[in-house]
A protein has these predicted regions:
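Conserved P-loop NTPase motor "coupling/switch" region that bridges the ATPase
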Residues: 30, 47-134, 309-312
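Structural recognition of the conserved hydrophobic beta-strand(s) that form the central parallel beta-sheet
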Residues: 11-12, 59-65, 265-267
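Short, well-ordered alpha-helix to beta-strand connector turns
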Residues: 6-7, 28, 54-58, 77, ...
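Walker B catalytic acidic pair
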Residues: 34-35
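Conserved Helicase C-terminal RecA-like lobe
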Residues: 139-281, 343-361
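Conserved RecA-like P-loop NTPase helicase motor core
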Residues: 13, 39, 236, 246-335
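Conserved helix/coil segment N-terminal to the catalytic DExD/H
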Residues: 2-30
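Substrate-gripping "pore-loop 1 plus following alpha2 helix"
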Residues: 38-51, 294
């Protein structure tokens, strides 16, 4: 109905882009894409649909705080200039600027930039791209990052090392296993948090070290509202059980948080993305479990650290020493959170364990 009305500006969410392109007569002469990174997949329907109708628009503007890696730029820039700078085909772009990295004979799993590719790509797109940091142009509060380290006891660490080495943790009524490096990454991060799903999706308790650290941080907040970022459902269940935390899912709960009426709230990074304004409710964010996604990490942090925040933002990361937590944190800090970074981290851990066990033998 809204499209039938005459207006200067129309607003639509990205989930309806395909519908808009296929069902509506295209008569827009300008397109503004908020969060251009959501069009970084050249295989996605929304990218293909918008690319098909892009020539009908005179001007296109794309906004994003997380453009991704060099490979992602092909689709994002292609939406803007219709392939003028980086080429019309992903294959040609890949051949020109990248080399195969991880492969199994003819199967290529990842690519790495050629020498000088990064500078060359940036030079090609520099005339249509501008980078601005919010803190350089807006009144932004200070943001401080902290690490809080925990360590498992000998019995708990033994279980972790067994899973790391064998990719299997046997129980009488259901094993915890991983079929590949990516799956093992998920299992190890779960165990670092304190619990893990077995093959029957039953939760296996490992330790409470992170819950204890979270309790200390909540007490140190001295009554100020705390927002806890979790990744796995069993993390949320344990946080809710111990601290009576309120998940920020319903509109009513979000409203109460913004009014300062929720002492401990929990949020999943995937639901804390673009456009959620909750900075009025607090200034303390605690990462109970980490993610490999730099975009989700940055967007979640930006829910509190943004214009309108009146306090210094405190972001804590609870890190389990000697676990994959350290690798995930390092990847986030180095802004290297691709699939290859995950696999490299797991392989390095496995290699270290297997090497140590061979020496013991």
């Amino acid at each position: 109905d809204a499209l039938e009305k005459k207006a200067s500006v129309y607003v639509i969410n990205r989930e309806n882009v395909v519908w808009l392109c296929e069902k509506h007569h295209w008569d827009f002469d300008m397109i503004v894409i908020d969060e251009l990174s959501s069009f970084k997949s050249y295989q996605a329907k929304r990218f293909k649909a918008l690319r098909r109708y892009r020539p009908k628009a005179i001007r296109v503007v794309g906004l994003t705080g997380t453009p991704g890696n060099l490979m992602d730029l092909w689709a994002e820039i292609g939406i803007l200039d219709m392939g003028q700078r980086l080429g019309r085909y992903i294959g040609a772009y890949r051949d020109r600027f990248f080399l195969p990295d991880k492969r199994n004979r003819n199967i290529i799993y990842s690519y790495k930039p050629r020498d000088g590719a990064e500078e060359a790509i940036y030079n090609l797109i520099s005339d249509i791209c501008i980078s601005m940091k919010a803190e350089d142009y807006l009144s932004m509060p200070e943001c401080l990052y902290h690490r809080v380290e925990v360590r498992m006891d000998e019995k708990e660490e033994k279980l972790y090392r067994q899973m790391e080495k064998d990719m299997l943790l046997p129980f009488e009524d259901g094993d915890v296993d991983a079929v590949n490096a990516a799956a093992l990454s998920g299992k190890l991060l779960q165990m670092a948090n304190g619990a893990v799903y077995d093959e029957n999706h039953k939760v296996r308790h490992i330790h409470d070290k992170k819950l204890d650290a979270l309790e200390d941080l909540i007490e140190a907040a001295n009554g100020k509202p705390v927002l806890v970022a979790y990744w796995y459902q069993h993390d949320l269940d344990r946080i809710v059980e111990r601290f009576k935390a309120v998940p920020l899912k319903a509109a009513g709960d979000i409203r109460k948080w913004k009014e300062g009426k929720i002492p401990v709230a929990a949020i999943h990074p995937a639901s804390a993305g673009h456009g959620l304004n909750i900075q009025d409710g607090g200034h303390i964010l605690i990462w109970f479990g980490l993610t490999w996604s730099l975009e989700l990490y940055m967007q979640c942090n930006a829910r509190l650290w943004r214009q309108g925040q009146r306090e210094t933002v405190m972001i804590y990361h609870i890190i389990n020493k000697g676990t994959l937590d350290e690798d995930a944190m390092r990847s986030l800090e180095q802004k290297d959170c691709g699939q290859s970074a995950i696999i490299d981290a797991v392989k390095a851990r496995i290699g270290g364990v297997n090497g140590a066990s061979r020496k013991d033998d």
